[in-house]
């Protein structure tokens, strides 16, 4: 980079002026420590900016550096606290695009704070003029730092015990239309879906407390629906009551009321609500024995562009640290963005104890979760009964499959729509347990089940031509 090299020597040895970032922050001989937090950035420097200088600038501007030397550097140990760009590699097939690896000392981050961690790593550097684009692809969170976080309130194993549901994915449905229903009609829709065979129903992400349906009324009618459906079916049911609110105080007031009326699970929009609010709510949920469903509303604004932003695998890791028992993760086969290998990479990062580096799935670092509970992935968005075999094969048992339009769009109503999905799921689980390959034989499995389930047969006929086949934006 071209700078005006104006420097002034003081008696103390301090040199004022501007110097290249790479002189301080590019350290290719550095060997990362087990306690370092590691980051992989996809970067495109401006013309004329060497990749070493750009990588060093990323390390500097996301840790201790600024655009000029400052005399207060002499008051601290810069080598102890600075971020270090320790490796840079070209991205195959891309012109002027590089993966830049940065190691951050653990002391740079407040314990147990995703908010502080992200403020440091991505808070300022993404607007740096020397970079045309920058994307945070992955983080390696050291075990020493993970141990300062509570993580999910309960996790997958505890949730299954609470619900007494084993050996299959959970089934859910988002109530539609997402806006405009009265609280009583909303509760009616919840009841019909749950009695039809679903485990959960869900508030949509933008249902909070609007004039047409205030939160307290919705909570009461939804809980009445849960209790009636449980009494009829003998199964434990739930509805994700969205407690996202304008302030943390109001959020906790809604959570307290949900617990008081007996709901087993509540919901939060973690990106629009913020990580501070989410961590607060996750800790409340563990103290109070309530499950926490997390919606990722706004994620595509941050993660969909390949060259700039933050990859969802990072947002998923941050959620596991901040706390949540469920997290929406795409479907691979539905209407929302999601290439299979990349999607399953971050799904494993959500629910497994240890995940090895696997660049083919976009996993840049080996991640040990140090016994932190896992997060159940939620597949939701444009799925219907014909997708069931693929969803069971792709996501396995430890997942929640949510059919919104694929339940409520059934010609005979909500309860038959729920029954169609439950029959399709049970048929796929039985076929899988018998050793059948659902990728090859899934269509036959659904057709066989439809012969003795009129509800499923009608759903199969309605959605037999519906596909969402578009090229994925998120590729390696």
UniProtKB/Swiss-Prot annotation:
Residues annotated to bind substrate: 124, 174, 178, 296, 328, 380
UniProt keyword annotation of Lyase present: yes
Cofactors, names only: Mg(2+)
Name of the coding gene: cbbL
Chain positions found as N6-carboxylysine: 202
Single biological process term from Gene Ontology: reductive pentose-phosphate cycle
GO molecular function, one term: monooxygenase activity
Keyword Metal-binding assigned: yes
Species lineage: Bacteria, Bacillati, Cyanobacteriota, Cyanophyceae, Oscillatoriophycideae
Enzyme Commission code(s) on record: 4.1.1.39
Principal cellular location given in the protein's record: other
Cellular location(s): Carboxysome
Catalytic activity: 2 (2R)-3-phosphoglycerate + 2 H(+) = D-ribulose 1,5-bisphosphate + CO2 + H2O; D-ribulose 1,5-bisphosphate + O2 = 2-phosphoglycolate + (2R)-3-phosphoglycerate + 2 H(+)
Misc. comment: The basic functional RuBisCO is composed of a large chain homodimer in a 'head-to-tail' conformation. In form I RuBisCO this homodimer is arranged in a barrel-like tetramer with the small subunits forming a tetrameric 'cap' on each end of the 'barrel'.
NCBIfam families in UniProt: PRK04208.1 (NF003252)
Name of the protein: Ribulose bisphosphate carboxylase large chain
Post-translation changes: The disulfide bond which can form in the large chain dimeric partners within the hexadecamer appears to be associated with oxidative stress and protein turnover.
Function, as annotated: RuBisCO catalyzes two reactions: the carboxylation of D-ribulose 1,5-bisphosphate, the primary event in carbon dioxide fixation, as well as the oxidative fragmentation of the pentose substrate in the photorespiration process. Both reactions occur simultaneously and in competition at the same active site.
Keyword list, A-Z: Bacterial microcompartment, Calvin cycle, Carbon dioxide fixation, Carboxysome, Disulfide bond, Lyase, Magnesium, Metal-binding, Monooxygenase, Oxidoreductase, Photorespiration, Photosynthesis
Taxonomic source organism: Trichodesmium erythraeum (strain IMS101)
Active site, UniProt feature: 176, 295
Family to which this protein belongs: Belongs to the RuBisCO large chain family. Type I subfamily.
Subunit (UniProt): Heterohexadecamer of 8 large chains and 8 small chains; disulfide-linked. The disulfide link is formed within the large subunit homodimers.
Stored SUPFAM superfamilies: RuBisCo, C-terminal domain, RuBisCO, large subunit, small (N-terminal) domain
CDD domains xref list: RuBisCO_large_I
Cofactor binding remark: Binds 1 Mg(2+) ion per subunit.
GO CC term (a single one): carboxysome
Chain positions recorded as Mg(2+) binding sites: 202, 204-205
Residues at the site labelled Transition state stabilizer: 335
């Amino acid at each position: 980079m071209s700078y005006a090299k104006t420097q002034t020597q003081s008696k103390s040895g301090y040199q004022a002026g501007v110097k290249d970032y790479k002189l301080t922050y590019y350290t290719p001989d550095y060997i990362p420590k087990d306690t370092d937090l590691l980051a992989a950035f996809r970067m495109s420097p401006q013309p004329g900016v060497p990749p070493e200088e750009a990588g060093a600038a990323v390390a500097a501007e996301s840790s201790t550096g600024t655009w000029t030397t400052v005399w207060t550097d002499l008051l601290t140990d810069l080598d102890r606290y600075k971020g270090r760009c320790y490796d840079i590699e070209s991205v195959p097939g891309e012109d002027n695009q590089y993966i830049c690896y940065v190691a951050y000392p653990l002391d740079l981050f407040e314990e147990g704070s995703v908010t502080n961690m992200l403020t440091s790593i991505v808070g300022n550097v993404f607007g740096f003029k020397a970079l045309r684009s920058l994307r945070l692809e992955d983080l390696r969170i050291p075990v020493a730092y993970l141990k300062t976080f509570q993580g999910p309130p309960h996790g997958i194993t505890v949730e299954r015990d609470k619900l007494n549901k084993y050996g299959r994915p959970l089934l859910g449905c988002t109530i539609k239309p997402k806006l405009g229903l009265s609280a009583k009609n909303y509760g009616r829709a919840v009841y019909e879906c749950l009695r039809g065979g679903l485990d959960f129903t869900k508030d949509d992400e933008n249902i909070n407390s609007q004039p047409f349906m205030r939160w307290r009324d919705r909570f009461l009618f939804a809980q009445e629906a849960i209790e009636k459906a449980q009494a009829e079916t003998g199964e434990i049911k739930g509805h994700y009551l969205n407690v996202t609110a304008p302030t943390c105080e109001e959020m906790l007031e809604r959570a307290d009321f949900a617990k008081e009326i007996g709901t087993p699970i509540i919901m939060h929009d973690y990106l629009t609500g913020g990580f501070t609010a989410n961590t607060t709510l996750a800790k409340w949920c563990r103290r109070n024995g309530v499950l926490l469903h997390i919606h990722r509303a706004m994620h595509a604004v941050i993660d969909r562009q390949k060259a700039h932003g933050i990859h969802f695998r990072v947002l998923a890791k941050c959620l596991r640290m901040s706390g949540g028992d469920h997290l929406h993760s795409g479907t691979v086969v539905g209407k929302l963005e999601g290439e299979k290998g990349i999607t399953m990479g971050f799904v494993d990062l959500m629910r497994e104890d240890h995940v090895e580096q696997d660049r083919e799935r976009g996993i840049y670092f080996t991640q040990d979760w140090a016994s932190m509970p896992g997060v159940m992935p939620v597949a939701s968005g444009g799925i219907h009964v014909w997708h069931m075999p693929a969803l069971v094969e792709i996501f396995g048992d430890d997942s929640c499959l949510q059919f919104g339009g694929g339940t409520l769009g059934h010609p005979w109503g909500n309860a038959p729509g729920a029954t169609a999905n439950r029959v399709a799921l049970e048929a796929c689980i039985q076929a899988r347990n018998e050793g059948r390959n659902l990728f090859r034989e899934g269509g036959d499995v659904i057709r066989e089940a439809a012969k003795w389930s009129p509800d499923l047969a009608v759903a199969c006929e309605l959605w037999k031509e519906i596909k969402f086949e578009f090229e994925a934006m998120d590729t390696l």
